């Protein structure tokens, strides 16, 4: 049970205790004749045996408990009984405190709700750690307080130092003049020259659209001595070009040997220039023939392999189709046989059975 529920329970209990005596019927004040005095409370109730009595509990030196029966009535004084000296009649309350009847019959009602509420608030404060400790001046408490004080001072000092550092840094920054770096736009070529190695960097060179005519012009300009280089992997075309060039040289040599020699030298120099640029020149007739032969052999092998593969594939497909048709026929026969057996069981005579019987 938590403290809030305890508090609500105690308040309900106290309200019952207080409200129960008040619920009794209030009696009208009786005016006594002159010469007579008040000797005690009147008791007009004839049924004295029905009245409840207090259960006296000695709770001296103990915290008040919560009794099972919260309602208790005070024993009434006998009719006409009065003390000459005005003695005090004591009755025990729920929490052990006594209520005293003063002289002249004026009763002082002692409220238990305030005491219970006070004790509950004290317990709540103790549980939160806000209440005053029992031994306020004990060594442990003093040591704890001193430790907390030192910690607070240390944190305060640290904050102050940090603030001072920040202020000093701001002053230094303000004193230094602001130097704006000059924005220098360097070209991609100069960057490449300055930085020999560039990692994780791709420089895109913007090139305009080049049409076919311009491409042809560029190709002609790149050609050296109006002689196209013999490059590529189309060995058949290269071989035909080499054969045509050799035939041209032979024809020119028959007419003019000097011109043929000049053309040969020109071809050699242009080939050397192309090779210097990194272009591989394929002008050897024998090597071109062997390369062409190898290429044709590979092509023939691939063709043969493909034919075998396609033939095997067609054969396999036909086998699968035949197997499928056989399985379908078998299933149909089984179905018809099943139907015939059912008919025979029912007593039907089939033409097949008659033929067998005749034989």
Swiss-Prot record:
<dbReference type="GO" id="GO:0003677">
    <property type="term" value="F:DNA binding"/>
</dbReference>
<feature type="region of interest" description="Disordered">
    <location>
        <begin position="295"/>
        <end position="359"/>
    </location>
</feature>
<feature type="compositionally biased region" description="Basic residues">
    <location>
        <begin position="295"/>
        <end position="305"/>
    </location>
</feature>
<protein>
    <recommendedName>
        <fullName>Surfeit locus protein 6 homolog</fullName>
    </recommendedName>
</protein>
<dbReference type="GO" id="GO:0003723">
    <property type="term" value="F:RNA binding"/>
</dbReference>
<feature type="compositionally biased region" description="Basic and acidic residues">
    <location>
        <begin position="349"/>
        <end position="359"/>
    </location>
</feature>
<dbReference type="GO" id="GO:0042273">
    <property type="term" value="P:ribosomal large subunit biogenesis"/>
</dbReference>
<dbReference type="Pfam" id="PF04935">
    <property type="entry name" value="SURF6"/>
</dbReference>
<dbReference type="GO" id="GO:0005730">
    <property type="term" value="C:nucleolus"/>
</dbReference>
<feature type="compositionally biased region" description="Polar residues">
    <location>
        <begin position="70"/>
        <end position="101"/>
    </location>
</feature>
<feature type="region of interest" description="Disordered">
    <location>
        <begin position="15"/>
        <end position="106"/>
    </location>
</feature>
<keyword id="KW-0539">Nucleus</keyword>
<dbReference type="InterPro" id="IPR007019">
    <property type="entry name" value="SURF6"/>
</dbReference>
<comment type="function">
    <text>Involved in a nucleolar function.</text>
</comment>
<dbReference type="InterPro" id="IPR029190">
    <property type="entry name" value="Rrp14/SURF6_C"/>
</dbReference>
<feature type="compositionally biased region" description="Basic residues">
    <location>
        <begin position="144"/>
        <end position="160"/>
    </location>
</feature>
<comment type="similarity">
    <text>Belongs to the SURF6 family.</text>
</comment>
<feature type="region of interest" description="Disordered">
    <location>
        <begin position="124"/>
        <end position="160"/>
    </location>
</feature>
<dbReference type="GO" id="GO:0042274">
    <property type="term" value="P:ribosomal small subunit biogenesis"/>
</dbReference>
<feature type="compositionally biased region" description="Basic residues">
    <location>
        <begin position="326"/>
        <end position="348"/>
    </location>
</feature>
